[in-house]
Amino acid sequence: MKTHFNFDTVVIGSGPGGEGAAMGLAKKGQSVAVVERYKNVGGGCTHSGTIPSKALRHVISRIIEFNQNPLYSEHLQSIHPSFYHILQHANHVIRKQVSMRFDFYQRNHCHLFFGHARFIDPYKLEVIRPDGTLNTLSADHIVIATGSRPYHPESIDFTHPRIYDSDSILELKEEQQPKHIIIYGAGVIGCEYASIFRGLGVKVDLINTRNHLLAFLDQEISDALSYHFWNNGVVIRHNEEFDLIEGLDQGVVVHLKSGKKVKADCLFYANGRTGNTKELLLENIGLRTDERRFLQVSNLYQTALSHIYAVGDVIGYPSLASAAYDQGRIASQAITQGINSVRLIENIPTGIYTIPEISSVGKTEQELTDLKVPYEVGRAQFKHLARAQIAGMEAGSLKILFHRESKEILGIHCFGERAAEIIHIGQAIMEQKNGGNTIDYFVNTTFNYPTMAEAYRVAALNGLNRLF
């Protein structure tokens, strides 16, 4: 027996993209249904991605800070908790996030359906509930916000108890904590978990399929991360690809195409993502995906079927929770108001939660050089800031790229603790209109003292002193 419901819009997925769309639609008076395949709202971001990994990272960075501070180490024993115990903190944060986000949907009168959604026709979905019951949902518009999952090459046995991806690593038991781990893939996820495991004292082999880390970053920032990893004992192997991954009873051996072999207690595969679209039965409505199952969309996030939108990780780049929410918001405006002029901001900040953090907004030196833009560089080393000295967070720097003639800020790159927060000061000034986005602002404004924000004044003065 099927129960049928009609709505103005159905949103598939309750992560940042789905939430942004649902909230925007509901606030415009639409009747909205949200379908979530997991038992709680929040999506992969809350349950297996951003929230748990950043909660892990925060605890471990504080433990490192405690253990390295001579004031504490002289009088107290160092702290060495397990990955499993720190996960309990992450789970506590997840529960808070779920409760808060569930309340958002309730307050905005969104109808929640927990189960797997699949298309019957372009305007109708079937939802299979956990107890096996079926609901059909009809709507004038549908928003696909199903996110992504770790990419699994067919040649790797992910059922092996010592081979993990970014979802299964969060199920690591206390007795399974490795002393040595191989991380295959040195993208954002791979680098973040390399920091996490090395911070726990685990030996880390980081296998990178490219010639340097995080190639989309400014070269200096990438080099700073590489040096920091090297200085902390992470072994990085660039330009390597696996030929065979061999799961053993007591470990994993990675056979590389270069002829090398690497052995460790376990393998964490972090090389790519794939869109969560297979179960939607898109073939029933003639909607196609690319080879990684990502959907193609217009600048308003419309798919090839104009009444069906897609937002968030299911469309691939930039695969940021922050961007996903805004994509959902923009899609909701297109649906309710027909607005076609709203766009994501041009300069989306990126935050990478390694230890220390990395954050960037705007152009890199390499991009400006290729564009033949006459730019100059201003730098501030954190070790010269009073606040960094007080906090014992002296590793890192801030780098401002600006036009030599107009002094317009072109890019900001930060490596160090709190980088993802610090970057937003520069981002706010970059977005100013009518000539307000110049490096002179940082020289002429007054900063609290002592603060990490002072790095902007130091970097601005450093850059202006280079002009002639």
UniProtKB/Swiss-Prot annotation:
Entry GO MF terms: dihydrolipoyl dehydrogenase (NADH) activity; flavin adenine dinucleotide binding; NAD(P)+ transhydrogenase (Si-specific) activity
Its EC number(s): 1.6.1.1
Gene Ontology CC annotations of this record: cytosol
Organism encoding this protein: Hamiltonella defensa subsp. Acyrthosiphon pisum (strain 5AT)
Cofactor annotation remark: Binds 1 FAD per subunit.
Gene: sthA
Organism ancestry: Bacteria, Pseudomonadati, Pseudomonadota, Gammaproteobacteria, Enterobacterales
Catalytic activity: NAD(+) + NADPH = NADH + NADP(+)
Subcellular location: Cytoplasm
A Pfam family per the record: Pyr_redox_dim
Cofactors that this protein relies on: FAD
Residues holding FAD: E36, R37, Y38, K39, N40, V41, G42, G43, G44, C45
UniProt KW keywords: Cytoplasm, FAD, Flavoprotein, NAD, NADP, Oxidoreductase
InterPro entries: Class-I_Pyr_Nuc-Dis_Oxidored (IPR050151), FAD/NAD-bd_sf (IPR036188), FAD/NAD-binding_dom (IPR023753), FAD/NAD-linked_Rdtase_dimer_sf (IPR016156), Pyr_nuc-diS_OxRdtase (IPR001100), Pyr_nucl-diS_OxRdtase_dimer (IPR004099), STH_gammaproteobact (IPR022962)
UniProt name for this protein: Soluble pyridine nucleotide transhydrogenase
GO BP: any one term: 2-oxoglutarate metabolic process
UniProt record similarity statement: Belongs to the class-I pyridine nucleotide-disulfide oxidoreductase family.
Role summary: Conversion of NADPH, generated by peripheral catabolic pathways, to NADH, which can enter the respiratory chain for energy generation.
